[in-house]
Amino acid sequence: MNVGIKGFGAYAPKNIIDNAYFEQFLETSDEWISKMTGIKERHWADEDQDTSDLAYNASIKAIEDAGIQPVDIDMIIVATATGDMPFPSVANILQERLGTGKVATMDQLAACSGFMYSMITAKQYIQSGDYKHILVVGADKLSKITDMTDRSTAVLFGDGAGAVVMGEVAEGRGIISYEMGSDGSGGKYLYLDRETGKLKMNGREVFKFAVRIMGDASTRVVEKAGLSSEDIDLFVPHQANIRIMESARERLGIEREKMSVSVNKYGNTSAASIPLSINQELQNGKIKDDDTLVLVGFGGGLTWGAIVIKWGK
C-alpha cells in the first residue's frame, strides 16, 4: 500500500508583525534580524485564539481538499508544543469541533519535528489496514510562550497551522522513505522553563545540532529511497533560520532554487513550519503531481524527522 497526502490545508493568523515592532522595546533592528535569521515578519494569533482554532482552520481546508467529509476521518493526530491546556488534547477538541465521530485522537509532542513524527505515525496506522483516512495537523501558538524581553528568541517565532489528510494514494506516490530520531542529552539546549512558562534556547548549540542533523538526515532518507540529490524536485526544511537552512541544503547538494523558503514571511512556527512552506509552494505552482520532495525538521528534545515523498493523490 502506498500512503501519502490526499488533502492539504494551511492557516496563518491575520496579525502580521514586522521586525520594526521589536525595535520599540528591544535593542535590535530590522537589518540585524533579517541578516541573522532571514525573518522579515511573522503572524501572531489574537489573544483569544487558541492553538485548536488555528488547527481547525487548517483542518477544514484539508478535509475539503481530500474530497471527503469529517465523518470519514478515522483518527486525528495533532503535532503541537502549545496545546490549549495540558488536557484535553488539541486533537480531542478538534474531534468535537469537526464532528468526525468518536474516533481515536492524540497530540504528539516532538516540538518542531512534530509534523514529521505525526505523518510517519499516520503512515504506520494506515498501512496496518485498521485506518483509512487520518487527519494530521501541525499547529502552534508560539507567541504565548515567547519571552518578549529576550532579544535572542523574541524575534524568531510565529503562529500557524497546517493539516493533511493521509490515506492510500496511487502507485508510485506517497511516502517513500523516512527517519525519526532523538538525542535527549541536548534537551537542556531548547526547552520550556517550568517557572516562567517561557521558551529558553541555547542558540549556538541548537544551531550546531540543526546544521548537522538536517543535512545528514536528509541525505540518509534520500539514499534509503534509492535516489540522489539530482532526483529531488523540492527541499522543504524546517523554517527556523535561513543560515541553518542554507547549510543543510549545501550538505544535501541541492540547488538554491530547489529549496522552499517561507521563514521570511512566517518566522519559526514549529510544527506548522513545513506545511506552511508547502502551502506557499502549492500556491506558487512549484509543486506538481509526481514531484519528489524532501521534508526535514529538527526541534526541542532534541528531535529530528525526515521524509521523502512523491507528491500526488
UniProtKB/Swiss-Prot annotation:
UniProt key word Flavoprotein: no
Residues the record marks as active site: C112, H238, N268
Compartment(s) where it occurs, according to its Swiss-Prot or TrEMBL record: Cytoplasm
Keyword Magnesium: no
GO molecular function: 3-oxoacyl-[acyl-carrier-protein] synthase activity; beta-ketoacyl-acyl-carrier-protein synthase III activity
Top-rank taxon: Bacteria
Domain comment as written in the entry: The last Arg residue of the ACP-binding site is essential for the weak association between ACP/AcpP and FabH.
Protein name (database record): Beta-ketoacyl-[acyl-carrier-protein] synthase III
Gene from which this protein is expressed: fabH
